Design a protein with these regions (language model features):
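Short, structured beta-strand/loop micro-motifs enriched in basic residues and often containing a Trp
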Residues: 24-33
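Cationic, low-complexity basic patches in intrinsically disordered or flexible, solvent-exposed regions
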Residues: 14
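C-terminal binding/interaction regions
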Residues: 170-227
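Feature captures the catalytic cores and cofactor-binding loops of soluble hydro-lyases/lyases
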Residues: 55-191
Length: 242
């Protein structure tokens, strides 16, 4: 796989864990997370975060990875959790900021930067949308002892926002704008998130895809005969063009 090829969830290998093994245990982690925390997480665990984390997406990655700026002073000591998201931020009457909702962004777009990002940021948890391939987890995450948490569905931006207690700091706001700036946020029970990529590089989505794919032929066999013979209608998986 090329360095930037991180789209999709990949395919889990036969003989590994099954979807029925997923327990979906609820877990609360306090940042910065420890190596023991990382090792304890299992695929499908429901995670809530307490403490401090920061937002970082394309603009911040460009500053840190491409321009070599490093994280702003003090951030790495506070937290090792990076949320791929944009905040809905506003200025309060006293001049401080409020973040009332966040919108996660798809993490595959950062694939080519992950190795250098982990080296320069010390991040151990990436929170984002949609997940990556198992190849990406094993190539980029596992060597740095990191895991991936995915947001759950759409429409939870306000729910996540209610867990934000305060804005600790904001960096590169004038240069990058609200959506791309780094927002350092104190949170309490921020979630739910799902463990999508664990410390061994396994993917929850790939595990689900594997079991779904095994039963697709059975699904096709149960389809009724199409009535109008329109282009693209079929009751055979092998005849599908996609």
């Amino acid at each position: 796989m090329s360095e930037g090829d991180t789209t999709g969830a990949g395919v889990a290998k036969p003989g590994g864990p099954r979807l029925s093994d997923v327990q979906m245990t609820e877990v609360r982690l306090t940042t910065p997370v420890s190596d023991a925390d990382i090792a304890s997480l299992k695929l499908g665990d429901i995670v809530y975060l307490d403490g401090v984390l920061y937002t970082a997406r394309e603009g911040v990655y460009r500053k840190v990875v491409d321009e070599g700026c490093g994280l702003p002073d003090g951030v790495a000591a506070l937290t090792n959790v990076n949320f791929h998201c944009s905040p809905a931020a506003s200025v309060k009457p006293d001049g401080t900021y409020a973040v009332e909702a966040v919108t996660a962004t798809a993490s595959f777009r950062f694939g080519k930067s992950f190795t250098r990002w982990f080296e320069r940021s010390g991040a151990k948890v990436i929170v984002g949308k949609a997940g990556l391939t198992e190849t990406a987890y094993r190539e980029y995450f596992v060597p740095h002892g990191a895991v991936y948490l995915t947001t759950v569905g759409y429409g939870l931006g306000a729910t996540y926002g209610r867990a934000i207690k305060r804005v600790v700091d904001v960096h590169w706001l004038k240069e990058l704008g609200i959506a791309q700036a780094m927002w350092v946020l104190e949170v309490e029970k921020l979630g739910p998130f799902l463990v999508e990529g664990d410390h061994e590089g396994r993917s929850l989505f790939a595990l689900a895809n594997q079991e779904i794919n095994l039963r697709l032929d059975e699904v096709y066999r149960g389809l009724p005969k199409y009535a109008m013979s329109r282009f693209g209608e079929t009751t055979s998986r092998k005849d599908e063009v996609v």
